[in-house]
Amino acid sequence: ATGIEWEEYAAGAEYAAEHGELLQPGALDAIEEYGWALKGPTATPIGKGFRSINVQLRQRFNTYANLRPVRTLPGVPTRFENVDLVIVRENTEDLYKGIEYMLNDEIANGVKLITKPACERICRFAFDYAAANGRKKVTAVHKANIMKLTDGMFLSTFREVAKDYPAIEADDCIIDALCMKLVQKPEQFDVLVAPNLYGDIISDLCAGLVGGLGFAPSANIGAKTRIYEAVHGSAPDIAGQNKANPSAILMAFAMMLNDLGMTDKAARLNAAILAQVAEGKAVTADIGGTATTTEFTDAVAARL
């Protein structure tokens, strides 16, 4: 037992279809009051409809840093054996600010909003994380060769902040070149810090390097609020069928336990997940098994 008392609230497209609103009343107030939340995957319509709940939560609570650890796991089929990197994604700005409008019937415009305070805040977060967790290098991800003002500001701010951390190696990589290098030799990277859009894209790419989104947890971190979740989406094609791999949300919960100071419980939960996957029995279909979500979760729980 963790000693955590839970309050549960519904959210997402299915809830909205029935109730006309994205979040059950009281959810935002509860997050505001407690400052900690574990969030399940929610669907967002493509090309129309309401804005992403994730984006709204991040902007409402100013959870400016999205922390996404990526590492190779024993028992998970992958092309790479020694991946161990962390993505630090700026969570509140860039094209994900959601500022879009029609100039006329044939021209749509989206605003890429980048501010120096947000750039400095996320870069400093990345270096502080590296220093606190024994990481040796931080790489800035950008396209400053083309977007000289927006990404240029991100890169120049990164270089300014890096001067305050002489013990940590700092370099940068253009986003398209980074994608190539990640699929060639991912072990060359340690901590990647990126604006919102690039961070989102490389998060999924890196998850693919270690076996897929089923093993990708994340934490949305602000000054007063932390929201933990799986990187993957709601997978509507298997929703309600008891087929999904719950590892990512369990690993996100382990991140939460660790940040709450329950480091022993976090380590035990992570070890139980890894042991279950490595054994290869009672695992879900995405990694070659036949177990249901419930069966996998029960097997992990039995190891605790």
Q: Model segments located where?
A:
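Short, amphipathic C-terminal "tail helix"
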Residues: D286-L304
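Short, glycine-/small-residue-rich phosphate/pyrophosphate-handling segment
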Residues: L73-I99, L113-A118, G233-A266
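Generic secondary-structure signature for well-ordered alpha-helical cores
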Residues: G3, E33-W36, R58-N66, E93, ...
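A short beta-strand-loop structural module common to alpha/beta enzyme folds
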Residues: T2-Y15
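Glycine-rich phosphate/nucleotide-binding loop
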Residues: A13-A16, P25, K181-K281
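Glycine-rich phosphate/diphosphate-binding loop of Rossmann-like nucleotide-binding domains
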Residues: A1, N104-D176, Q188
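N-terminal glycine-rich phosphate/adenylate-binding segment common to multiple enzyme folds
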Residues: A17-K112, L197
